[in-house]
Amino acid sequence: MDNSVLQDAILNGLISTQYQGNALIGPQLLTNNQSSTIWQTLRHELLSCKNFTWSVAFITLDMLVPFKAVMADLAQQGVQGTIITSDYLNFNHPAMFEELQKIPNLTVRIADLNGFHTKGYLFDHGEYQTVIIGSANFTRSALLVNKEWNLKLSSRQEGSLFQQLTAELDAVKHESTVLTSEWIAAYRKNWQPPKTRVTQPEKLKPIE
């Protein structure tokens, strides 16, 4: 990708619409609405990336069904991914960790950090990187229905923002361990459902 294309797309989103925009790599505010969902953007980024690293606090079982289907396609292309998550507030169900562990081209790490509440999705496309950061956890409600705000930005690895992000991810990885069956067994033994849960909407959009 020519530097001028990426530069104009960034300037279009952050400085002035007089610059040439680009729907694929230009800065965007992602929300759930009648025409699109956050999950649709995540899915597109997954299917077009060379590898990815996510740092996300909460994950629900119902989102793993479409995610595992995408990961199966990526496995045929040799694409690997990493998810850093945690046991924060006991939100994540033990069965969710078991399902993640079944995905062969996915490395799952458990952050050993108090108050781990990140929601960041980094995709490496080779010539450029894309990050989605905002309010959405990897839950069906957040990615399909809820009023969520997430910023999508693309840049080169040499960009200051992405160097900061990479450094932060490296720091979180350093404070994490690889998910194991032993960890899941111990978590399941002590796990209790959270006393308060986010209310689920009555109707959820079908996952595409």
Model-predicted segments: where are they?
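PLD/PLD-like phosphodiesterase catalytic module centered on the HKD motif
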Residues: 1-208
